[in-house]
UniProtKB/Swiss-Prot annotation:
Family annotation (Pfam families): Ribosomal_L35p
Ranges where the record places region Disordered: 18-39
Biological classification of the source: Bacteria, Bacillati, Bacillota, Clostridia, Eubacteriales
UniProt-recorded name of the protein: Large ribosomal subunit protein bL35
Family under the similarity heading: Belongs to the bacterial ribosomal protein bL35 family.
Source superkingdom: Bacteria
A GO biological process held by the record: translation
Length: 64
């Protein structure tokens, strides 16, 4: 039986926590930030946890 491989695009964007939750880095932070409020940019710095419905999909393509 062949090895199970991780989806490489998903592996670069999502991380599994020790408790099994899926973290991701939010979008809209990389450029064109001059018109965005400082509070919004600060809030986009932290990693967010995906909702349960999306976590199920990501765990299927990230077996390791």
């Amino acid at each position: 039986m062949p090895k199970m491989k991780s989806h490489r695009g998903a592996a670069k964007r999502f991380k599994l926590t020790g408790s099994g939750l899926v973290k991701h880095y939010p979008s809209n932070k990389h450029h064109k930030n001059t018109h965005k409020k400082e509070n919004r940019i600060r809030a986009l710095k932290r990693n967010l946890v995906l909702s349960k419905s999306f976590q199920k999909n990501i765990r299927e393509i990230l077996p390791h």
